[in-house]
């Protein structure tokens, strides 16, 4: 029999917080590090309990991500092949025409996606660029798809414009812990990112915010990223967890491979600390075998990016995704769009589509 919904917050979460952390933080960094230190099976067991209390454990949302403006970005994010500062073979392109974007969105819906994300390699959008993106949002929304964009930094009035267009989610990742951030990016500050997230939240748009693991961060710094996310008020509605995709020409191309179990642990800790968030298995999935992806679902991931490209890096082919989900007995979830202002009603109306692998 289902007991009262579980929101796993150990007593350790009440421990003294780290310097610079708000004294009323829901999760101290020490408590999060304690989760990372749990035996693997214990951590996954707790994460699965939290997941089942808040979601259908056998359902996954399919998202498609389209790069609507590729390359030529002036930023110096050390992991990114779209930076104009690195020779990665990614050529700068113009913003895609609206008709081409809507055609891609239509294909995504036909292939089973319920969420369509649009990414542009900008530091921050100019007024005419934002006007075009707002029109794209309106067109995608008219198809019945959930919408998300990631365009760089936003001003308050720009966030309001996207809200007026009907945008559901704005993605702006923190990437890593504050103290490690300067090792990865120098062209925008951590506070710049927090300011954009505040503008998005104030406009009434759902926040999509996560990070990247495998950048060379320590477990302490990985816990710091989760602490920043989990202690947002409210914590993000959508939390993409990315595994570094090493691209030749970027400063991080020679990084050591992350232990796969450490990636699964990060998914599990995100699920425990942000129980009602959509935890999205994001970049790096192309290099994961089926067993590792299954462990990520067990740990609480309930969304994948679906399609052949994730911005400029490979992503598992759609047919392989369908076959994997079918082998696991998982279903595609098509959720009514929700704005969890206080993360209430995470189990609102939804339907499921059984997955049949293509021949």
Swiss-Prot record:
[4Fe-4S] cluster binds at residues 73, 77, 80. Pathway: Cofactor biosynthesis; biotin biosynthesis; biotin from 7,8-diaminononanoate: step 2/2. Keywords: 2Fe-2S, 4Fe-4S, Biotin biosynthesis, Iron, Iron-sulfur, Metal-binding, S-adenosyl-L-methionine, Transferase. Binds 1 [4Fe-4S] cluster. The cluster is coordinated with 3 cysteines and an exchangeable S-adenosyl-L-methionine. Residues 1-22 are annotated as: Disordered. Its cofactor is [4Fe-4S] cluster; [2Fe-2S] cluster. Residues 58-285 form the Radical SAM core domain. InterPro entries: Aldolase_TIM, BATS_dom, Biotin_synth/BioAB, Biotin_synthase, Elp3/MiaA/NifB-like_rSAM, rSAM. GO terms for molecular function: 2 iron, 2 sulfur cluster binding; 4 iron, 4 sulfur cluster binding; biotin synthase activity; iron ion binding. One of its GO terms (biological process) is biotin biosynthetic process. The keyword Nucleus does not apply. It catalyses: (4R,5S)-dethiobiotin + (sulfur carrier)-SH + 2 reduced [2Fe-2S]-[ferredoxin] + 2 S-adenosyl-L-methionine = (sulfur carrier)-H + biotin + 2 5'-deoxyadenosine + 2 L-methionine + 2 oxidized [2Fe-2S]-[ferredoxin]. Its EC number is 2.8.1.6. The keyword Iron applies. [2Fe-2S] cluster binds at residues 117, 148, 208, 280. PROSITE patterns: RADICAL_SAM (PS51918). Homodimer. Catalyzes the conversion of dethiobiotin (DTB) to biotin by the insertion of a sulfur atom into dethiobiotin via a radical-based mechanism. Belongs to the radical SAM superfamily. Biotin synthase family. This is Biotin synthase.
């Amino acid at each position: 029999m289902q007991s009262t919904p579980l929101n796993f917050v150990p007593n350790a979460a009440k421990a003294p917080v780290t310097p610079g952390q708000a004294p009323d933080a829901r999760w101290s960094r020490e408590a999060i590090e304690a989760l990372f230190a749990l035996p693997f099976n214990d951590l996954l067991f707790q994460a699965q309990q939290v997941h089942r209390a808040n979601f259908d454990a056998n359902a996954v949302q399919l998202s498609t991500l389209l790069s609507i403006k590729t390359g030529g970005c002036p930023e110096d994010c050390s992991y990114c092949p779209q930076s104009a500062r690195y020779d990665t073979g990614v050529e700068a392109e113009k913003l895609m025409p609206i008709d081409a974007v809507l055609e891609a969105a239509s294909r995504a819906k036909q292939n089973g996606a319920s969420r369509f994300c649009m990414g542009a390699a900008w530091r921050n959008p100019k007024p005419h660029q934002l006007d075009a993106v707002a029109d794209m949002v309106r067109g995608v929304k008219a198809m019945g798809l959930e919408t998300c964009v990631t365009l760089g930094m936003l001003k308050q009035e720009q966030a309001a414009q996207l809200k007026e267009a009907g945008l559901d989610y704005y993605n702006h990742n923190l990437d890593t812990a504050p103290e490690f951030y300067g090792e990865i990016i120098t062209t925008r500050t951590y506070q710049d990112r927090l300011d954009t997230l505040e503008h998005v939240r104030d406009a009434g748009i759902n926040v999509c915010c996560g990070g990247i693991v495998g950048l060379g961060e320590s477990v302490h710094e990985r816990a710091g990223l989760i602490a920043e996310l989990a202690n947002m008020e409210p914590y993000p509605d959508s939390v993409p967890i990315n595994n570094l995709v090493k691209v030749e020409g970027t400063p991080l191309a020679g990084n050591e491979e992350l232990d796969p179990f450490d990636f699964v642990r990060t998914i599990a800790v995100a699920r425990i600390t942000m129980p009602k968030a959509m935890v999205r298995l994001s970049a790096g999935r192309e290099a994961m075998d089926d067993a590792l992806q299954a462990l990520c679902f067990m740990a609480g991931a309930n969304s994948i990016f679906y399609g052949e490209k994730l911005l400029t890096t490979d992503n598992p082919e759609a047919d392989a995704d369908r076959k994997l989900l079918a082998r696991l007995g998982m279903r595609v979830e098509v959720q009514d769009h929700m704005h969890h202002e206080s993360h209430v009603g995470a189990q609102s109306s939804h339907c499921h589509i059984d997955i049949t692998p293509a021949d």
